[in-house]
Amino acid sequence: MVKSTAILGSTGSIGRQSIAVCRARGIRVTALTTNKNVELLLKQIEEFKPEYAAASDTEAAEKLRSALAGTDITVGPAGEEGLRLAATWRDTDCVVTAVSGAVGLRPTLDAIAGKKRIALANKETLVCAGSIVMRRAKETGAEIVPVDSEHSAIFQCINGRRGELKKILLTGSGGPFRGWTREQTASVTPEQAVKHPNWSMGAKISVDSATMMNKGLEFIEAMHLFGVTPDDIEVLIHPESVVHSAVELIDGTVIAQLGVPDMSLPIQYALTWPERCVSDADRLDLTAMSGLHFMKPDYELMPCLKLAIDCARLGGNAPAVMSAANEAAVALFLSHRLGYNEIYESVSAALSDIEFIAEPSLEDILASDREAREFIKEHYT
């Protein structure tokens, strides 16, 4: 179990649950960051007394600096630099990357360079630059332990037996609009899209779960985390969200990880691994369940999932373009400036427009990210 951790994005959904795990397990918190929620961050600071704090938003950063004036807490700059300083803060064993978007990439690489454990909750880091990130982690010996429930499940099922792995079975609920036609989803509102049937999550990831883009991002992430090809991963729709994922081994054995839909469990495991600690989470009562159901995804009704898998096969800068365009499109949708079905259409258009780079450098990836965001802004606002 780690003794100290920095939490990037401590006021978001994953960040707040990470805070709760640190409280329960007595893990020292050395650094905390937020985007804009200074009010909650100050409450967290009062309780955990970190050495460092930062807010990414410029106005929020000034508010934080003013509130902490005269204290011993170092207040970092706004923007990416504040996150990077948190990720490399002294005497920190682990960094929880609970920020959303490509902004988490450089801080994660910095933490890897510092040989810290990465409790990875930022999908975009591996989606955009998985090959680079995993290579650098191997070079430094930094541990990357997934926080996503699906990847945590796979991590636990493999349990070091990488050579015995035949196939990853990546499960997803299908979201709140499972079975809806494209005609029906055309009128979906942000308020409907953020209401996931099983999980309590932030707005962006809730929309991604509704469109199934989230499962596509997880598909790409799994490729890099576990060193497999697209042909080694099968997506299964599992409405109950009880089987968080499974693996098929070379002898035909299938090992699955089951549990209640509670993100505190994979967060705790990422911080305590290789130990397993007592948890206050609800227990799974198998006798209370009427059944577990699994089905193949309908790609016509889930075009974002198909698009992501196509990008996984294509590789290069395609996943980075897709991820950035999707992030920008979802932001427009949440502000009622883009239709639900237009999320897929706009991301697909960005992929068609932006130049493909087969073997991108980190700079190429970041440039592709910026270009994709600009494309969405220019053509859809």
PLM region spans:
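Catalytic, metal-anchored helix/loop core of enzyme active sites in primary metabolism
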Residues: 1-381
